[in-house]
Amino acid sequence: MPENKPEKLVIVATHGPEDPERATITFVMGNAALAMDAKVVVVLQSNGVHLATKGFYEHVFAAGFDPLKKLVDSLLELGGTIVVCVPCIEARKITTDQLIPGAQPVKAGRVVSEMLEATTVVSY
């Protein structure tokens, strides 16, 4: 008999504070999937790494949505995972100490592994 695994959604975010709507929708969708009992991994690459950087994520607001900080905190509290591209943070002179609690710095191998295990991968 096949295993009955939960759905897994990987959401890749490449936009940061410069595009607050795309940045916010990443976490709206992640929280919605968690509410539906899916496993969720948010991958932050390129400017998306700012969404898990102290001093940035607290100041992202998109019209019609909850503040990004509230959505990020909710995603982590509900059991979602946030992984952050190490080369991307290094290119932006962001240290791992500047990442929010719960954000995991990772390299390409981990990201590819998460994607290969996913039921669905989307990008914002």
Residue ranges and their predicted role:
Residues 11-24, 56:
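Short, glycine-rich nucleotide/cofactor-binding loops
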Residues 23-38, 42:
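Histidine-anchored nucleotide/phosphate-binding helix
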Residues 59-86:
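A glycine-rich helix N-cap at a beta->alpha junction
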Residues 91-94, 98-117, 122-123:
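C-terminal structural segments of small proteins and small subunits
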Residues 48-62:
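N-terminal beta-loop-helix "entrance" segment that forms/cooperates
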Residues 58-63, 98-102:
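Short, flexible loop segments at the rims of nucleotide/cofactor-binding pockets, characterized by
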